[in-house]
Regions:
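Conserved AMP-binding/adenylation subdomain of ANL enzymes
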Residues: 292-333, 341-385, 400-405
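Conserved pre-ATP/AMP-binding loop-to-beta segment of ANL
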Residues: 96-98, 220-221, 237-272, 279, ...
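Conserved ATP/PPi-binding loop(s) of AMP-dependent carboxylate-activating enzymes
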Residues: 474, 478, 489-493, 504-539, ...
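AMP-binding/adenylate-forming catalytic core of the ANL superfamily
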Residues: 166-192, 206, 380, 387, ...
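Gly/Ser/Thr-rich phosphate-binding loop
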Residues: 351, 355-358, 385-388, 400-482, ...
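Structural core segment of the AMP-binding/adenylate-forming
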Residues: 154, 158-248, 390-391
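AMP-binding/adenylate-forming catalytic domain of the ANL superfamily
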Residues: 221, 606, 639-664, 676-706
């Protein structure tokens, strides 16, 4: 069964390069045109509707209240996301094209064509239906980077179940929160995962996460690590009547499935991101708008658009085009190195590459197993053209190969595009990757976006003059000079501003707040079961103007290029993973050694930032040595949240500095640890705590002298 012929929309825009999308009408028309990238069963009746927050007056405590923002795109339109990502490519005669190149950490490999992927998704969809999963039900997927993760993700999209992927490195407690918060009916997990040459048990975490009160009816278990070992297979913990092996569920299922049609505004997935209150926020993304902007930005940033000849006689992609260049699609092998649970992978490792019909690589393990050249081997083996990764990973490769890989040892000749995501990249890492993996000529897209925006907001373009051979463009041409660590400008169809707390523009070079003042279709619609938190987190400050507050600091140069400066709230960005300081503090104070905790970010050459914990101690804690305390508390955080959240250091202090309203001054804690000037401390209720902490840091050799 195929969808009807795509509805023919009127093209409201003149297809010229670099369109000025200044008006709301032009912006909406642009996204209507880009929506033609997808196959729709029924057209929409309303392209876009945005109800900005409006003041509702003041409550009894004098706090201004606002209405909840409402964001809609392509209302009335019907489609199937999985059909758009897989089936339509098969129907177009491209079923034999490889969709996924999978490489496991132990070295096992598999090439899965679009036709085979379609078959496996159908069997998984039928399996979910046999367990009673229906449209709107939530399915939590707790799997490593393996084909089954993508298969179940698209099976959920196919039947209209809402998927929520959870990072395999998260603890049972973190998984349990997501299982309970989503009200999931099914949890999909694995017996174990391969990590740094070892098999790490996973099913035990899943079982712990399902303890207590929840809505879990079934746990599907993928046999990843014990299939060849009957003893290990039999030792996997099991709950009869609830647990089912993946192969037992799907082997006898039909390999075809008559998919359903879904409204453009039906929820597609829930993705959790840390917030300043400690409790992760479940952001809801919807089917139509998310897939439209994902399809377009993937095509724009990874060079799939058709070219035109510019005024300098150079081929450049037509940024307005709603179709891709077939030859570019066929020649692309895309690799986004993110874990599939992160939004980076949702957009540019699952949905983006597949909706555009390219081949992509997924790799299960760590980049240094069994050696630091593993990623280089993967690039060479599959002929990777696009390598999209995180600054932390680049810095780790720099540490292993300061002067680059041994000349001639690896073939990087296929690499034509590099990308960075998750945090600001330092210029040294930018230059190192471009020189040693990109041959000094590859385009480098330094992307800025968030879980909330769903897809890239700001980025250089692959064919910017900066990446053309020297002399191609006249001096003074916009974007002619490479700017390492610069997100440059917004992609077409959205726009940003850098403003002060009053919403006024800041001077070039001065730090302000970056806001998205014209949103695109992939913007999150709400926080799961908590629309008030959606308002308070993102829209309260500038919402009446229709501006989304991203929570990042930024600055612009004289030419309007955007530089992202990091978080303005109490979230730590560690290797591109956003973690709440309060969430870490909450874990620390559950340990019997700790009375109170204050956690702050400090700069780190490898991961960008790390967490440092200041703690006041109980008598039990005071009986521990410094090393014993650090070991106990880092292990405790690892168990409660996950390894990524463990503090780099633990400092025992007599008191935690706070404002007069009782808020921990995390900024000051970070400045103290890094030996920096504190500035104004007049708002503190216990200023003397600063002097004590400064002396502790000196006495323990952490800083050379007190500030």
């Amino acid at each position: 069964m195929g969808l009807p012929t795509p509805y023919s929309f009127t093209d409201p825009l003149n297809p010229t390069p670099n369109p000025a999308l200044e008006s709301d009408e032009a912006r909406v028309a642009f996204w209507e045109k880009q929506a033609q990238r997808l196959t729709w069963a029924e057209p929409w009746h309303t392209a876009h509707r945005f109800e900005k927050p409006k003041s509702l007056g003041f409550d009894e405590e004098g706090i201004e209240q606002f209405s909840i923002p409402e964001i809609k795109w392509f209302e009335g339109g019907k489609l199937n996301v999985a059909y758009n990502c897989v089936d339509r490519h098969v129907e177009a005669g491209r079923g034999d094209k490889v969709a996924l190149y999978f490489e496991g950490e132990p070295g096992d490999r598999e090439a899965i064509t679009y036709a085979e992927l379609q078959r496996r998704i159908a069997k998984a969809a039928n399996g979910l239906l046999s367990l009673g999963v229906r449209k709107g039900d939530r399915v939590v997927i707790y799997l490593p980077v393996i084909p089954e993760t993508i298969i179940f993700t698209l099976a959920c999209a196919r039947i209209g179940a809402i998927h929520s992927l959870v990072f395999g490195g998260f603890s049972a407690e973190a998984l349990k929160f997501r299982v309970e918060d989503t009200g999931a009916k099914v949890l999909i997990t694995t017996d174990g995962q391969n990590r740094r040459g070892k098999v790490v048990p996973v099913k035990v975490n899943a079982d712990e996460a399902c303890s207590g009160e929840n809505n879990i009816e079934h746990v599907i278990v993928v046999d990843r690590t014990s299939a060849s070992d009957p003893v290990a297979h039999a030792a996997v913990p099991w709950t009869e009547g609830r647990d089912v092996w993946y192969h037992d569920l799907v082997d006898d299922q039909p390999d075809t499935h008559a998919y359903e049609l879904h409204d453009a505004e039906d929820p597609l997935f829930i993705i959790y991101t840390s917030g300043t209150t400690g409790k992760p926020k479940g952001l809801v993304h919807t089917m139509g708008g998310y897939l439209v902007q994902t399809a377009y930005t993937h095509a724009l940033l990874y060079d799939l658009l058709p070219d035109y000849v510019d005024e300098n006689g150079v081929l450049r992609p037509d940024e307005l085009s709603a179709v891709n260049d077939p030859e570019k699609v066929e020649s692309t092998v895309h690799w986004c190195t993110a874990d599939l649970a992160w939004v980076t992978a949702h957009t540019y490792e699952i949905y983006g590459p597949l909706v555009n019909g390219v081949s992509e690589v997924i790799y299960e393990g760590t980049p240094n197993t069994p050696h630091y050249g593993r990623h280089f081997e993967v690039i060479e083996r599959y002929g990777v053209t696009n390598y999209y990764t995180a600054p932390t990973l680049i810095r780790s490769l720099m540490g292993a190969f300061p002067d680059g890989p041994e000349p001639g040892k690896y073939d990087f000749s296929t690499v034509r595009l590099l990308g960075s995501v998750g945090e600001s990249i330092n210029p040294e890492a930018w230059r190192w990757l471009r020189q040693h993996v990109g041959g000094g000529t590859a385009a480098f897209i330094d992307t800025w976006w968030q879980s909330e925006t769903g897809s890239t907001v700001c980025s250089p373009r692959p064919h910017d003059p900066a990446f053309a051979p020297e002399g191609t463009y006249p001096e003074g041409t916009p974007h002619c000079t490479p700017l390492p660590g610069c997100a440059t400008r917004a992609v077409p169809g959205v726009s940003t501003r850098v403003v002060d707390e009053h919403g006024d523009p800041v001077e070039p070079g001065k730090q302000g707040f970056i806001v998205v003042d014209k949103i695109g279709p992939s913007m999150a619609r709400t926080v799961w079961q908590n629309p008030q938190r959606f308002l308070d987190s993102y829209w309260r400050h500038y919402g009446e103007r229709g501006w989304f507050l991203a929570g990042d600091g930024a600055k612009e140069d004289e030419e309007g290029n955007v530089y992202i400066l990091g978080r303005i709230d109490d979230v730590i960005n560690i290797s591109g993973h956003r973690l709440s300081t309060i969430e870490i503090e909450s874990a620390l104070v559950t340990h019997p050694a700790v009375v109170e905790a204050g956690v702050c970010p400090v700069e780190d050459d490898l991961t960008g930032h790390q967490a440092v914990a200041y703690v006041t101690l109980t008598d039990e804690g005071k009986a521990l040595t410094e090393d014993e305390l650090k070991a106990a508390l880092t292990a405790h955080v690892r168990e409660h949240i996950g390894p990524i959240a463990k503090p780099k250091d633990v400092v025992a202090v007599a008191d935690i500095p706070k404002t007069r309203s009782g808020k921990i001054t995390r900024r000051l804690l970070g400045e103290l640890y890094q030996g920096r000037s504190l500035g104004d401390v007049s708002s503190l209720q216990n200023e003397e705590a600063l002097g004590h902490i400064a002396q502790v840091l000196v006495d323990t050799g952490r800083v050379s002298e007190a500030v």
